[in-house]
Amino acid sequence: MSFNLLDLPIVPRQKALKYLEPIDLFELSLCSKRMAQSVRDLKIEASAHFITLTRGQSSVHVQFKERSRAIWWDFKEIFMKKDLKDKRKIGYILFENCEKFRRGAFTLDEFYCHFDNLEEGAAAVSKHFQFLFPGPLNILLSPTVYRHLEFLFFEPSIQKCESFEMCGADIPAKRTMNRIFDKLTIEKKLCIRPKTSENYVIKQALRVEELFLRSARWMTREHLLELNCIVADLSDHNFQCSDFEAFAEKWMNNKSSKVENLRFQWQSDVEFKLENLKTSRWDSTRRERNYIFTMKNESVQIDCSDGFELERNDGRLATFVVEQQEDRTHILYFLVWIELFPEKKRLENLPKTLGPLYKQLEKINRDYPDESSLERLLSNPNLVYTEFLETYKVLKNMDGENRSPSTGQAFRRTIFDKIYNTIDL
């Protein structure tokens, strides 16, 4: 006996739908606009939407906050067109050659599809995903590979994204850049990996939270003074020492500045000097030696002991730090000290951070009571951190002689590694 799911009252209908995986909800949503709205009414949020159009990949996918299985729609021609026999209509587009695959081991659900206009197809699929499962959009694009960007950015749901990354080796034409930046609003992160024309100004680059430019020669002093990114990494620019002084002076007079971590890289034989800016040397009573931040999920430390210190009238400190490489490459950091003693704070929080790991060790030692004396020592949450680091190095050296660790030893090593990496920045 069959029945129409939409004939159910709204509460039991929503309860029934919530038992389904996102890919099944997506399939149901293609039945009618009413069913699509019913799926949207479940309020299943996406952690992120992605559009990837590069030389090696052309896909749309969505990841979820509370669901483990992502949905992928892949336009890459992995299978023969004649073997993709399903049809699906999304919006006004009929995809005549597609096929669904479910991969339990990889916790993802995937559609493979042949479609000639990839930009138009990606826009249609992403628009529907975003309607069903609201969440931020991230775009990765090789603009010199895909020639019909007007079909992608014509769609309003694609005209605003959380992050935009441009990749590729060729310099994009001005017309191509206009097709992107005349339509697209970027809310948080902009990364442009290829070189770009010195004559093309990307105004919204100055206002995103995170900015990464391989080529910043289009930026003038006026653009530098407008820069209000939390994090920026600019290579190959035309700035002089006097421009950096002007930037620092503006920061000194601007308490609302969002700037925290700026990195400038260029090649020159000119020594970095601050001629007119009043600076001081490092005072260990006012801040720590190292500036600590996270990059690509890894902790990074910059030694600021030889930096040029600035103090704003509200007490906020900033430091210019210069690193010079052997190949004439200069790296200049402008670092704002939001936390004056980050390592001290990190060490104070370590017991709380490491607590769950030591709890896991307790359970492992109960289930596998074959720990050695060194392993028992390392399992002690009250062990001094420096002693843990030294003891674990000794244990790792001894492991070379034991090529067949027991199950308990293998489990303990995994936790010890995590503790070691957490303690030792």
Curated annotation (Swiss-Prot):
One Pfam family here: F-box
InterPro entries named in the record: F-box-assoc_dom_typ2, F-box_dom
Annotated F-box domain residues: 2-53
PANTHER family, sorted: F-BOX-CONTAINING HYPOTHETICAL PROTEIN C.ELEGANS (PTHR21503), PROTEIN CBG06869 (PTHR21503:SF49)
Protein name according to UniProt: Uncharacterized protein F59B2.9
Organism: Caenorhabditis elegans
High-level lineage: Eukaryota, Metazoa, Ecdysozoa, Nematoda, Chromadorea
